[in-house]
């Protein structure tokens, strides 16, 4: 998974082409850390069609607010720089994330 920061988010996600999944997480978020291995497994299956990335929101608070990330974990899918779907908090389960990814490939 490509580790985003406030400097690379613009080029990798907002100016990117195709589908990009962003895992918004933080070190203090236990559900985020529990979900991460599942997301990494999905990358092995769907990584050809969707670019998998993650952003530690504690290092990019303003960016998270700008992207309307109101709770963690938030898993968002962008297409050609536009956010097209997201799952937040309790909805961000491995099964729901995989279903969301499959919807767009």
Curated annotation (Swiss-Prot):
Pfam families: Thioredoxin (PF00085). GO terms for molecular function: protein-disulfide reductase activity. It comes from the Bacteria. Residues 1-105 form the Thioredoxin domain. The keyword Transport applies. GO terms for cellular component: cytoplasm. Disulfide bonds join 29-32. Keywords: Disulfide bond, Electron transport, Redox-active center, Transport. Signal peptide: none annotated. The keyword rRNA processing does not apply. PANTHER family: GEO12009P1. Belongs to the thioredoxin family. Participates in various redox reactions through the reversible oxidation of its active center dithiol to a disulfide and catalyzes dithiol-disulfide exchange reactions. This is Thioredoxin. It comes from Acetoanaerobium sticklandii (strain ATCC 12662 / DSM 519 / JCM 1433 / CCUG 9281 / NCIMB 10654 / HF) (Clostridium sticklandii).
């Amino acid at each position: 998974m490509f580790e985003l920061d406030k400097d690379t988010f613009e080029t990798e996600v907002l100016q990117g082409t195709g589908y990009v999944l962003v895992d918004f997480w933080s070190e203090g978020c236990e559900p985020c850390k529990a979900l991460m291995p599942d997301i990494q497994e999905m990358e092995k299956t769907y990584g050809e069609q969707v670019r998998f990335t993650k952003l530690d929101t504690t290092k990019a608070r303003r960016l998270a607010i700008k992207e309307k990330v109101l709770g963690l974990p938030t898993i968002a899918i962008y297409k050609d720089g536009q956010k097209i779907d997201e799952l937040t908090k309790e909805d961000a389960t491995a099964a729901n994330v995989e279903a969301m990814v499959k919807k767009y490939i």
